[in-house]
């Protein structure tokens, strides 16, 4: 079983698209088309843009989803893929790969999402922090104690907390027992109630689309379950903006399938989580075009 994993925000690195553009000439046209749909120069962002520019939420989300889709269309054209899933904004790429929405529709939604989340983040000083290790019940208790919210359940003993920046700093200073806390370099408290205004903004645009049911297996960040209804999955993309990412449940769903999980660029984080959390899966991160040779496709 061949499954495509689409990365989330924070995976991008300066110039990561350069080797892909050299190896796949058609990629530039794909990126240009997707960039036009979302109002961004994806080729420049993925090649010559400075690191600070691609860290910006408005740019990062466009670049990550656009790159994943462009590489997928260039590398996997004609390849039978059995399923797809994404982490956070990566779900928009997964939705397009599964045929629920078109590539350009995905980019339009991502553009609205990125801008709305950046705007919401600018209203209040908020942040996020990864809690590594510790007992889950104790970690969640500490998150609640500091009036924070769990934003990501990544599995492998990693939960991301989010909320007021001052509260995040207190959590860093007083980590739960047997854990360490690392503040993340992000613009705000994504996947929490602080993003409610962004959710409403994206919902208005989503209402104008006509999604269809997925053509392949498509797992949801809501509960790790398989999506059957395209309209319901699109609604879940919207609701997830202010709700936690349950990547842990996605990995539970992958367990027992004996799947080969291919992470699209910018790759690395999800493949690492799958390697640690799904014992019978083979995870391949497409960091450079050389990694495509590892994929069992003909």
Regions found by a protein language model. Name each.
Residues 254:
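Small/polar (Gly/Ser/Thr/Ala-rich) solvent-exposed segments
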Residues 9-11, 36-38, 98-242, 272:
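Alpha/beta catalytic cores of group-transfer enzymes, especially the acyltransferase/condensing modules
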Residues 206, 278-281, 296:
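C-terminal alpha-helix/helix-terminus motif
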Residues 194, 291-298:
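Short, charged, surface-exposed secondary-structure boundary motifs
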Residues 246-247:
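Amphipathic coiled-coil/heptad-repeat helices and related helical stalk/stem segments
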Residues 1-138, 184, 261-290:
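FabD-like malonyl-/acyl-CoA
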Residues 178, 258-259:
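Short, high-confidence coil segments that cap the C-terminus of an alpha-helix
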């Amino acid at each position: 079983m061949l499954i495509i994993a689409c990365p989330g925000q924070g995976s991008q690195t300066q110039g990561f698209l350069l080797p892909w553009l050299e190896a796949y000439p058609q990629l530039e046209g794909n990126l240009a088309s997707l960039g036009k749909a979302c109002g961004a120069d994806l080729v420049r962002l993925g090649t010559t843009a400075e690191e600070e520019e691609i860290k910006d939420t408005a740019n990062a989300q466009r670049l990550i989803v656009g790159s994943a889709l462009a590489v997928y269309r260039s590398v996997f054209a004609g390849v039978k893929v059995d399923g797809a899933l994404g982490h956070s904004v990566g779900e928009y790429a997964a939705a397009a790969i599964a045929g629920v929405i078109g590539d350009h529709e995905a980019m339009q939604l991502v553009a609205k999402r990125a801008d709305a989340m950046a705007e919401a983040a600018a209203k209040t000083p908020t942040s996020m922090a990864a809690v590594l290790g510790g007992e889950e019940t104790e970690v969640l208790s500490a998150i609640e104690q500091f009036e924070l919210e769990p934003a990501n359940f990544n599995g492998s003993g990693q939960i991301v907390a989010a909320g007021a920046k001052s509260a995040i700093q207190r959590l860093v200073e007083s980590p739960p027992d047997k854990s360490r806390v690392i503040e993340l370099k992000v613009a705000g408290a994504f996947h929490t109630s602080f993003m409610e205004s962004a959710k409403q903004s994206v919902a208005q645009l989503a209402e104008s689309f006509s999604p269809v049911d997925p053509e392949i297996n498509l797992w949801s960040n809501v509960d790790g379950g398989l999506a059957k209804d395209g309209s319901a999955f699109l609604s879940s993309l919207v609701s997830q903006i202010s709700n936690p990412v349950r990547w842990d449940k996605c990995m539970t769903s992958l367990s027992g399938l004996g799947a080969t999980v291919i992470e699209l660029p910018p790759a690395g984080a999800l493949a690492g989580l799958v390697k640690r959390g799904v014992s019978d899966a083979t995870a391949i991160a497409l960091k450079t075009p050389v990694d495509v040779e590892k994929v069992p496709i003909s």
